[in-house]
Structure formats: C-alpha cells, structure tokens
Amino acid sequence: LETIESEWEKYQKTNQQNSLTAAAIDNLVKIDREDRLLTLVNLIDPNQNNALTLEQLQQLAKHLQTVAQQRGEADLWQIATGINLGLNTWSNLSNDLTSWLYEQNRNLGFTNDNERVAPWQIWASKVNPSWLKRVLESLANQQAFDSITQDLTLADWVETAIVFQYIQRGLINFFDQRIYSEKLGAKLSISTFLTFALIWSLLTNSFEQVSKNSLYSRGCFQMALQILRTFAQRDYFPLYGGIFASFSGSYLKEALDYLSIPLRYVEGTGEKARILTLIAYSNRIRGDYPQARECHQQALEIARQQQDSACEIANLNHLSRLNAIQKNYTEAINLSQRALILSRQQGNSLGQANALANLGYSQVQEAQQLERYDPEIYQSSIEYLKQGLKLAESLQDWQSKSLCCSSLGLAYLVLERTQDAINILLQGLESAKYYGDVYLQGLLLTYLGEAYYQDKNFEQAIYMGSLGMYWLHEIGAVEWRQAASLLTVIRGKNIAAFEQTFSLERSSLIKSIGLEGYQYISEILSKYQQGN
C-alpha cells in the first residue's frame, strides 16, 4: 500500500507538472507575439502559485523548440534558446553563488570600493561571451547600461532574466538562513532585494530612453516589480527606508495596477501599501515632495484598510518628516503626535522612536520659526528626542538611533550648544555607518560640517561638508545642496585658505571615497555655484 501510495503521489506530481508546462506552451503560442515576453515573465514570477520550476522550464524550452520549428516562428525559438542558455549559465554560476562572501578582511556589499568586495566580476568570469556578461561587467565597473541596451536579442534578454532571478533567489535563501546572525542576515537580504530591484529599474530606464525599446523596458519593469512584491512579504521589509529609484507617470500607474492583483497577505499586510511606502520615501530623498506626499497618502489609506498598523504608523511618521522639511511644523507636530499615540497603543517601539524624533525636531523648529525663546519649550522637545534615542538604543535599531541623533544634534545647533551637537551627531554617524544607510550618513556629515563651522573649526567643517555633499549627490538626495551651500560660504570667506585646507584633507578624503571621488567634489561644488 505504501508503494502504491508513493507511486500515485509521484504520478500526480508528474501529471501536474506536465499540465502546467502544457498550459505555459499554450499561453505562449496563442498570445500575440508582442505579448510573449511579458507572458514568460509572468510564468516565472515567484509570486504566482504555479511559477515554473527549473525542471518545468527545461520541458518548456524543449517543447517550444519543436513548436517553433513546426510553425516557423523565430521569436518562439529565441525564447526557447534564451531559457536553455539561462539554465546552463545558472548551472555554471550556482557553485560560485556565495564564494565572494568569504573574501577575508572585506565588508559585504554589491559595490566595488576600497572596503567592499562585490560579486559581479567573479560571476562575469564564469559566463560565456554574451549580453549577460556585458551586463555583469558593467555592474563590476559601475558603468551605465546605456551603451549595451541597443545590441541584444530576445534570447539574450530571456537568459539574463532567468539567471538574475535565480541568483537573487539563491542569495536570499542563503541569507534568510541567518547563518551569521538574524540582524546581519536580514540586512544582507534587504540589500539583495534592493540591489536587484534597482538593477532592473536602471535597465528599464536605459531601454526606454536610449534604445527606445518599450518591449524590453516593460519586461525589465515587471521583473523589478516582482522583486519588490516578494520583498514586501518579508518580516524585515524596511518601512523606514527607500530604494532611491524614480517611479513616475505610466510606470507608477502600472505598478499600482500590478499590485492591485489579489494577493495573499501576510498577517493582514497590504503589500501594495508597503511598496508605496518604499517608493514614497525614495521620492522624498530625491526631493520630489509632491510625489512622495501622494504615495505616502495612498499607502496610509491602504494600510488602514488592511489594518496594517506598522505600515500606518510608518507613513504618519514619514508624512510628519515631509511636512517638517517643507517647514509646515504645525502639521508635522500633529502627525508625529498621532504616530506616537498609535505606536504606544500598538506597542510599536520602532514607530514610537521615530515619532519621538519627529515630534522633538518639529517642536524645536516651530519655536525658532515663531521666535519663541522660552527654555521650557526647548527642554521639553529635547526630552522627546532623548526618549526616542534611548528607545532606539534599547532596540539596537541603528537607523532609528541615527535619525534621533540627527534631530537632537540639530536641536542643539539651534540652541548654539555646539559641542553637544558635535558629540551626538558623531554618535549618529557611527550608527548610520554600521547600518549602511548612505542617506543618513550624508545628512549627518552635512550637519557635522555645520556644527564645526559654528565651532569655527573650518578644517573639520570642510572635511565633513565635502563628504556629506559627495554621498548625498551620489544617491541623488536633494540635501547635497545644503552641504554645497556651507562649503561655498566657507570658501567665500577666504578662497586661498579653503583650497589649502581642501588639499591638506586630500589623503583623508581619498581614503573614504577614492581618488575619483576626491576629484569629483570640486566638480559638484562648481555645479552648485553655477546654479545647476
């Protein structure tokens, strides 16, 4: 009986796989030719209940080749060829998927710099000459994709889609095992999700703007959305972080339409709200405040409908921060108070820490705006900020700690407590570095530049301001202009002294951002002074 049962289960499984493969072939053959690529992308979407497995993809490629020969359809043959190439390439790469993680005395990451080792060149060396190899080499050399998006076949694109998907999924599975620690595993998984989503977003833009190939552009965009959709289901999804990618116009509409498909929610969470939160945060950092506000408002409404209190609190906090940036401090205070009350009711310590940081910061700024100089007002605000900082430290939440430190440091600067500001901002900078938040690092470096300027330590002001401006400019954050303004003021007081100090800081700056980064600082400053 056990043998019969085992054979029956095996038969059912095989029959189901054959049925799925047959259905996939039927879909690809019958659908309009211009829709075949997107249909394939949908068939390999891991968010689907019946996403094709490696074995089923092999069967699909085999049958597609037969159908393509019978019907004389080149695009079906190209798709089949791309699937086979992708499976073979993945087979060659899979053994080296994680070898780059074991480089000694190097930090982990996906960018090549003095402190990190990235996997792109290692993987490129394992790949035969192909369009995929050129993509990997572009990533290794940190080059734009514009020069390679005009010369590829359908098979090239399909191979890349399959290989990148299995690389990303393999790394996520590896990191999610928490082989190092829970926090480090989550951090590496987050980095992987965002890196591959960003790669597909960059390819989307290159195909759209350079090669004018809307088919490949739409395919890349769908791959990015699939990654974000999977990411939104993870318990470590960063409600207080962003991807620094721009979604606008028809692509934003397509994102909303795609994510409106009925989804399996995790603990009542609306994935669409979480992805919108991520996109909105990114838009705020880039300075697109209207788009950020619109996305946060939509995310807030959906989160309430789905009873996702963590997402609701996060968007209240983000909207508070956005209003504070736009100097609408009364509304910022109101939103942060609502976030604080709700987070305390729900026992959401992370939301509470962020709400306290926003509340204290907004109160200090409003008092300055209204020219109120009552010490009790400032002391009350600083107490909120200290509570938030203490809470973030107890959670070992380095991102929230760096946010609290930045707000507290600014409050001290307003009160001209310069040394207190420097001390707390340095703490925040260390936390931001540990967490790997480039935006907060750039912001804290800029604030430190202003603090040292207030302290008349112009050497440190130039050093910190230069680093802050560089990192913020690198990620497209609008606050780079704040750092550039500081450096311009210092330079305006004594050009010769500024240039001499900048030269003296050369070795320290090169150690942090490399020779090209050091040289680029002057270009960024010149760009600001020319009004660009």
Residue spans for each PLM region:
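Short coil/turn linkers that connect adjacent helices within long alpha-helical scaffolds
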Residues: 265-267, 302-308, 344-348, 390-397, ...
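TPR/TPR-like alpha-solenoid signature
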Residues: 270, 277, 317, 357, ...
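Tetratricopeptide repeat
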Residues: 255-259, 292, 296-299, 319, ...
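Structural signature of alpha-solenoid helical repeat junctions
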Residues: 271, 311, 351, 377-380, ...
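Alpha-solenoid helical-repeat scaffolds
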Residues: 160-335, 339-342
